[in-house]
């Protein structure tokens, strides 16, 4: 499986962006849920 460096970098950048977005989304949901529990 041979991938050109540019394509590989593009793939890793997308993968990294997806992980960062997932972490941000998960953290936002977690904090919003925690905030609701604290308010109750």
From Swiss-Prot:
<comment type="subunit">
    <text>PSII is composed of 1 copy each of membrane proteins PsbA, PsbB, PsbC, PsbD, PsbE, PsbF, PsbH, PsbI, PsbJ, PsbK, PsbL, PsbM, PsbT, PsbX, PsbY, PsbZ, Psb30/Ycf12, peripheral proteins PsbO, CyanoQ (PsbQ), PsbU, PsbV and a large number of cofactors. It forms dimeric complexes.</text>
</comment>
<comment type="similarity">
    <text>Belongs to the PsbX family. Type 1 subfamily.</text>
</comment>
<dbReference type="GO" id="GO:0009523">
    <property type="term" value="C:photosystem II"/>
</dbReference>
<dbReference type="GO" id="GO:0015979">
    <property type="term" value="P:photosynthesis"/>
</dbReference>
<keyword id="KW-1133">Transmembrane helix</keyword>
<feature type="transmembrane region" description="Helical">
    <location>
        <begin position="10"/>
        <end position="30"/>
    </location>
</feature>
<dbReference type="InterPro" id="IPR009518">
    <property type="entry name" value="PSII_PsbX"/>
</dbReference>
<keyword id="KW-0472">Membrane</keyword>
<protein>
    <recommendedName>
        <fullName>Photosystem II reaction center protein X</fullName>
    </recommendedName>
</protein>
<dbReference type="Pfam" id="PF06596">
    <property type="entry name" value="PsbX"/>
</dbReference>
<dbReference type="GO" id="GO:0031676">
    <property type="term" value="C:plasma membrane-derived thylakoid membrane"/>
</dbReference>
<dbReference type="InterPro" id="IPR023431">
    <property type="entry name" value="PSII_PsbX_type_1_subfam"/>
</dbReference>
<keyword id="KW-0812">Transmembrane</keyword>
<keyword id="KW-0793">Thylakoid</keyword>
<keyword id="KW-0604">Photosystem II</keyword>
<comment type="function">
    <text>Involved in the binding and/or turnover of quinones at the Q(B) site of photosystem II (PSII). PSII is a light-driven water plastoquinone oxidoreductase, using light energy to abstract electrons from H(2)O, generating a proton gradient subsequently used for ATP formation.</text>
</comment>
<keyword id="KW-0602">Photosynthesis</keyword>
